[in-house]
């Protein structure tokens, strides 16, 4: 057995520091200088070429059996090995090499053999060595000029420790001693093949715990810390049995105030364990040994004793408190014990996140602080708001407030109540507001106008509407950022104010006295002609004449029953960033015969899809979307002329009983015509270009064919074109000669 000093010297070399890396470890290798016992080279001092192999292994020399059928290759490799301070025994073939191996007096430490040889090949020699009881501990290295994957896999699968590709480099031969070092340490039981620094562990506290630890196989290396040191198949743990010894490893925190006694870190006798230095003590975790912290050490010690006790035995019953734990790496933790002990979880990263310091936990509580700030703002605005009653029942609001969380990560918009210009804020949701610097603010109107949120909206009611407003599950509205009275959208109760948004699809009113709930369509692209509140809705039928007739009746009857001066709309803004404005022709129609008590307005065919700008109430905004019916104020938008026309700077004004005025400017039409003209010019240019290209190609094809035809018709002499006159002369001369011959 070697001492600790030898371990310290061999550890670095075994982990990648080769013999010939700097010509330090092996004196005389490549003409280098001599190395002192501490490992530092002494320059300028020339010594005879010798090696102190006892620093690394318990042998004075390393004998290498070189097997190669080619004489020149064998001589060159032998010279290189001798230059690296190895003792070489050459062999011409596999049979001669096997003879040397059977002679125990040779004490061969390493076999370097060629794969392809006459007679007994290298693979056959490898099989013989692996099947021999004594020779199987000798590391065998195969070498060949054929680096095919099948050959390499075949050699390594049969027991070879390495495969070298010819031509062999000198640095590869300098590092061959590492295989001997690993094999010596794995067989002696004083270390492991991986070269990690090892030491003897303490004796076990009890036989039960040692047996449990002996049967375990810790592989918790989530954070890059090697928890176990697994020996190879041929390792010996010192007790005569060959098995894995990964059960001896423990992860101990450096910052833990509670010292872990040798009894708690118990291991069976005659075993080795690796010393692992943990750089992050709060992240490292062990499957069997719980981690500790700074507080309540006594209480934690009792918990550790219960956790490490006989309940860990396989097959033994557990108490009720820990009955749910299906594996030893799971552990129940109370909320009050989070500061006292670290939870044992499969995912060590999640455990590390839960075990942060209190300062970081407080800093992470951003949502709670936002909720507190919004509560304070709500209280301040409620105190400054004038007294105005809402027609929404308080019970419904309370119930809804209890159901919904204090901080909604949704696009819901707060509601406001009021009549006319005095609209106040009834309640505010603790919703996430976006900053004015957001990229979406560029698509909104100036601050002077009321900004409509983006999203789907429900409908609202008239002044004397006491019915329950419809609830839209798919209605998500964003909260307005303007300081003016916000526009109420997607409300769950009924109120008096007018809800305005931006849309091109629906201009509807809330039923005045009907108690039944009507579901608002959540789809924007509705291709139907029916009313939004008609019981028989067919939003996907492109031609529904029956629905159209019923819609006319419903709209006309709603116009009679509606309060004067009220203009209701259900507006939806398309979420595209580029705004294509749509201009509506608003007409005023007067009523028909009696119909169900629901006020509604309708958009007739063709179905229009567009993007409207923001709308406002009693202000100059974009959107001329509301026409008045003279007396009743119910609107009907009919026959949108073009699917992509523009609304610009429209106004929605409320007058007295006479109704409202719907007006809009045509500045958007000029822009549309300009764009349309540019598009037409572009299309015409493309068509013209394609036509010219077609004609040009056709002309080329015609010219090519005509020239080809002419070339075929022209006479040739020995491949060269000749004139027609020359050919005629030749023909005439040939005729004369034929006549003379006759």
Swiss-Prot record:
Residues 299-313, 331-341 have a biased composition (Basic and acidic residues). Residues 63-181 form the Response regulatory domain. Residues 186-195, 490-502, 618-634, 719-731 have a biased composition (Low complexity). GO terms for biological process: cytokinin-activated signaling pathway; flower development; negative regulation of long-day photoperiodism, flowering; phosphorelay signal transduction system; red, far-red light phototransduction; rhythmic process. It is found in: Nucleus. Residues 236-248, 318-330, 503-512 have a biased composition (Polar residues). Residues 682-724 form the CCT domain. The keyword Aminoacyl-tRNA synthetase does not apply. One of its GO terms (cellular component) is nucleus. Keywords: Biological rhythms, Flowering, Nucleus, Phytochrome signaling pathway, Transcription, Transcription regulation, Two-component regulatory system. Residues 697-708 have a biased composition (Basic residues). Residues 186-249, 290-346, 377-402, 478-517, 533-568, 590-671, 697-742 are annotated as: Disordered. Its main location: nucleus. Residues 656-667 have a biased composition (Gly residues). InterPro entries: ARR-like, CCT_domain, CheY-like_superfamily, Sig_transdc_resp-reg_receiver. Belongs to the ARR-like family. Probable transcription factor involved in the regulation of flowering time under long day (LD) conditions. Functions as a repressor of flowering. Controls flowering time by negatively regulating the expression of HD3A. Acts downstream of the phytochrome B to repress the expression of EHD1, an activator of the flowering promoter genes HD3A and RFT1. Controls photoperiodic flowering response. Seems to be one of the component of the circadian clock. Expression of several members of the ARR-like family is controlled by circadian rhythm. This is Two-component response regulator-like PRR37. The lineage of its organism: Eukaryota, Viridiplantae, Streptophyta, Embryophyta, Tracheophyta. The gene is PRR37.
